[in-house]
Design a protein with these regions (language model features):
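Local sequence-structure signature of Cys/Sec-based thiol-disulfide redox active-site neighborhoods
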Residues: 1-28
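Residue-level signal for short amphipathic helical patches enriched in basic/charged
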Residues: 7-13, 35, 51, 69
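Conserved short-loop catalytic and cofactor-binding motifs
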Residues: 10, 32, 44, 66
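Short alpha-helical
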Residues: 13, 39, 64
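Thioredoxin-like thiol-disulfide oxidoreductase module
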Residues: 33-51, 77, 81-84
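Structural micro-motif
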Residues: 48-57, 67
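Non-catalytic, surface beta->alpha helical segment in thiol-disulfide oxidoreductase systems
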Residues: 58-84
Length: 84
């Protein structure tokens, strides 16, 4: 299973929803809190081209935010990505 990384902040409700969805599916992930260090946001922009949160990566592939994660989950494509 590829690594899943969630870039988030403490004040973002969509970040909480994304992490909750991953938890409910039993998908392990690493959470990177952008509040901890401003350099993390620069790294996020470099990796994804976006500065909004949450941003979710599966392996080194950015998939977007909570809406994209939910759509992948509902379509069954999230399981496919994680099985690769």
């Amino acid at each position: 299973m590829p690594d899943v990384t969630v870039y988030s902040t403490t004040w973002c409700p969509y970040c909480d929803r994304a992490k909750r969805l991953l938890d409910q599916r039993g998908i392990p992930f690493t959470s990177v809190n952008l509040d901890d260090d401003p350099r993390f946001r620069s790294a996020l922009v470099e990796l994804t081209g976006r500065s909004t949160v949450p941003q979710i990566l599966i392996g080194s592939e950015p998939i977007g935010g909570f809406s994209e994660l939910r759509a992948l989950d509902q379509s069954g494509k999230l399981a496919e990505l994680l099985a690769a």
